[in-house]
Amino acid sequence: MTQHSRDTPQFYLTAPSPCPYLPDRSERKVFTHLVGEKAGELNDLLTHGGFRRSQSIAYRPACDQCRACVSVRVIADEFQLSRGARRVLARNADITGSLRAATPTSEQYSIFRAYLDQRHRHGGMADMTVLDYAMMVEDSHVETRIIEYRRRGADRVDNKRGDLVGVALTDVLSDGLSMVYSFFDPSEQNRSFGTFMILDHISRARQLGLPYVYLGYWIEGSRKMDYKGRFLPQQRLAPTGWLRVDADGETKHETTE
């Protein structure tokens, strides 16, 4: 095998399978492996083109006659908190997030297992074991971090950390943060914790001087994915490039990035 063939990504197409988001549709994905010294650069490039990462695989939808999955990224430094977002932050004022190495723990898995059992018991990840979870976190050749969200415990006499409430697995890209997967204690559902973690990532991107937070795929009409369209202004990937959607919901112009 030549050096050129090792460095050039090979792309593959999956067989059709039932769509997990829209009824009576099937999905196909195109994917490649993210390995080697240039995995980070390739992940950056592919993310800009609408790919997502899962372990050491980068993939994007390649469905026949369907383009419902739209890659979205929030424009972090222009994002303005709505009244609803401020209420979410207020409900989670007792929570602090800590950036850590991508190392799985049994505490994380307990929350992950409860989250799947409560909210995604029939999904494709429903049967994941603790070893599967460890692979999801550790099998990465790019810059990946874990953010643990805990109740504030700094004032406790025993100096122990507060209870773990949520976790985000996040890639650090050259131009933003990419939320690979996030989950939370389902008993805390009144906190709107998924929204809170996105708001926290927007704040972190600003602090790091990164322009975007990549949320994955927005799917209009899908209860599971439609919420991603609420974080405005954002950019949505169209066949002609990234399109800006302003806070009023109007598409204003096409970006050149």
UniProtKB/Swiss-Prot annotation:
Q: Which reaction does it catalyse?
A: N-terminal L-glutamyl-[protein] + L-leucyl-tRNA(Leu) = N-terminal L-leucyl-L-glutamyl-[protein] + tRNA(Leu) + H(+); N-terminal L-aspartyl-[protein] + L-leucyl-tRNA(Leu) = N-terminal L-leucyl-L-aspartyl-[protein] + tRNA(Leu) + H(+)
Q: Which residues form the signal peptide?
A: none
- Any idea which UniProt keywords this protein has? Acyltransferase, Cytoplasm, Transferase
Q: What class does this enzyme belong to in the EC scheme?
A: transferase
Record GO cellular component, one term:
cytoplasm
- Primary localization: cytoplasm
Q: What are the GO BP annotations of this UniProt entry?
A: ubiquitin-dependent protein catabolic process via the N-end rule pathway
Write down the InterPro entries for this protein, in alphabetical order. Acyl_CoA_acyltransferase, Asp_Glu_LeuTrfase, N-end_Aminoacyl_Trfase, N-end_Aminoacyl_Trfase_C, N-end_Aminoacyl_Trfase_N
Compartment(s) where it occurs, according to its Swiss-Prot or TrEMBL record: Cytoplasm
Q: Which Pfam families match?
A: ATE_C, ATE_N
Q: What PANTHER family does this protein's entry cite?
A: ARGININE-TRNA-PROTEIN TRANSFERASE 1, ARGINYL-TRNA--PROTEIN TRANSFERASE 1
What is the recorded function of this protein according to its Swiss-Prot or TrEMBL entry?
Answer: Functions in the N-end rule pathway of protein degradation where it conjugates Leu from its aminoacyl-tRNA to the N-termini of proteins containing an N-terminal aspartate or glutamate.
**Family membership noted in the UniProt record:** Belongs to the R-transferase family. Bpt subfamily.
This chain's protein is named Aspartate/glutamate leucyltransferase
Q: From the UniProt record, report the name of the gene that encodes this protein.
A: bpt
